[in-house]
Amino acid sequence: MLPTQAGAAAALGRGSALGGSLNRTPTGRPGGGGGTRGANGGRVPGNGAGLGPGRLEREAAAAAATTPAPTAGALYSGSEGDSESGEEEELGAERRGLKRSLSEMEIGMVVGGPEASAAATGGYGPVSGAVSGAKPGKKTRGRVKIKMEFIDNKLRRYTTFSKRKTGIMKKAYELSTLTGTQVLLLVASETGHVYTFATRKLQPMITSETGKALIQTCLNSPDSPPRSDPTTDQRMSATGFEETDLTYQVSESDSSGETKDTLKPAFTVTNLPGTTSTIQTAPSTSTTMQVSSGPSFPITNYLAPVSASVSPSAVSSANGTVLKSTGSGPVSSGGLMQLPTSFTLMPGGAVAQQVPVQAIQVHQAPQQASPSRDSSTDLTQTSSSGTVTLPATIMTSSVPTTVGGHMMYPSPHAVMYAPTSGLGDGSLTVLNAFSQAPSTMQVSHSQVQEPGGVPQVFLTASSGTVQIPVSAVQLHQMAVIGQQAGSSSNLTELQVVNLDTAHSTKSE
């Protein structure tokens, strides 16, 4: 045997005896007892004897073939990163003993001399590359920081969208599940598909017809050029102002498992400071509502009872002044809240419209905790001259907090209005005032003869002027929650009808 072959045999015998190699064949296993002495002295047969002279010579020849040029490039790469040979070389190196330690290689150098050490080093070239962290057969680059810019390659862009959309949906689910928060996520692809994730309270934003119409209106609108408004740019930035001016009150009913209809998110209209006394007139049968055409939301004015012990605080926002207030005291029938005419519900902000005040006033008797008093609701119409430009009072609340509160659902072409205590059965009324020309909206009263009936108010419009959805849901009569048996509160039922239909809506 040549010295080179003897050194290689000794190294192989040592590695096999320590159990770090995959070359433990059935023929080599009987000689395992003398493996240690065979490796140290090179004379006593160990596992190396079990390999047979033919196999050993082939291994030594393969090791000697790679000896002449053990350069740094061969040590680190060995082949192209994408080639198949790189993987084969790496697997072959693992079969020849990937778990050998540095001390074992030093033993091989001592036994076989410089030539054996060179042969061993050359034979395990890819192993050194694996230790350095640059595996030749690795297909992915791992974590690489990419530039935050639009991807021009269409295939790469589609792939990135698919992966990251799935990831952000998963993150939204994890956020809502781990922390119990309400999450609404909407992703619209460039192919026209809309993907959404919403928790229980926010599902009506994407399942109701009004919510779908609002989403489609926003997505179908032309993309406006970048504006000089700094707030818009900051909100589109990852490090911008994430918090909005919208707030909602969290109460015990969030964890009591109420129905989804009761916990619908909504805009709750609360107290407005600076409201002057309105001129009350006798109930009439019509009211004129003039709305100038423009790219803003419709304006609906009405009066509602509010708490007398409210001290609101003003908060400024990009879409106009928003006053947030909370009411927790008993409802007073003497206090009137007037929603002004110049509030606009539109993303991005819009110029508020000036509309003469025409309002629907709701008188409501005090609803105390006393079980012996019944409260009733009657509907009258008031009107005041001039133009009101007071700021809007809007407060988001997912749970009704006061009995006299009212809720509004904004939409691109309508404002949905309903008392909070009437939302238990999913009732909703659409007050639609969006038109291209001044129009007239009729409010007619109907008397109910049978006892226990619900007074009704019909909002009708002439054909072609005011578009009122026929599928509007009526407000039904229901008892106010929290009062004892024998005491109930009748709510006024508002029915929205359209003169275009052949038949009028039936009263419940």
UniProtKB/Swiss-Prot annotation:
Q: What is its main location?
A: nucleus
> Which superkingdom heads the taxonomic lineage of this protein's source?
Eukaryota
Subunit structure, per the record?
Answer: Binds DNA as a multimer, probably a dimer. Interacts with MRTFA, forming the SRF-MRTFA nuclear complex which binds the 5'-CArG-3' consensus motif (CArG box) on DNA via SRF. Forms a nuclear ternary complex with MRTFA and SCAI. Interacts with MRTFB. Interacts with MLLT7/FOXO4, NKX3A and SSRP1. Interacts with ARID2. Interacts with SRFBP1. Interacts with FOXK1. Interacts with LPXN. Interacts with OLFM2; the interaction promotes dissociation of SRF from the transcriptional repressor HEY2, facilitates binding of SRF to target genes and promotes smooth muscle differentiation. Interacts with NKX3-1.
Using the UniProt annotation, give all residue ranges assigned to the region (Involved in dimerization). 168-222
The record's Gene3D superfamilies line, in alphabetical order, gives:
Transcription factor, MADS-box (3.40.1810.10)
Q: Which intervals carry biased composition (Acidic residues)?
A: 81-91
Q: Which residues are glycosylated?
A: S277, S307, S309, S316, S383
Can you say what this protein is called? Serum response factor
Q: Which UniProt keywords apply?
A: Activator, Developmental protein, DNA-binding, Glycoprotein, Nucleus, Phosphoprotein, Transcription, Transcription regulation
What GO biological process, any one, is recorded here? cell migration involved in sprouting angiogenesis
The record's GO CC annotations read: chromatin; cytoplasm; nucleoplasm; nucleus
Pfam families, per this entry? SRF-TF (PF00319)
Q: Which residues carry this modification: Phosphoserine?
A: S77, S79, S83, S85, S103, S224, S253, S435, S446
Compositionally skewed regions (Low complexity) per UniProt: 1-28, 61-80
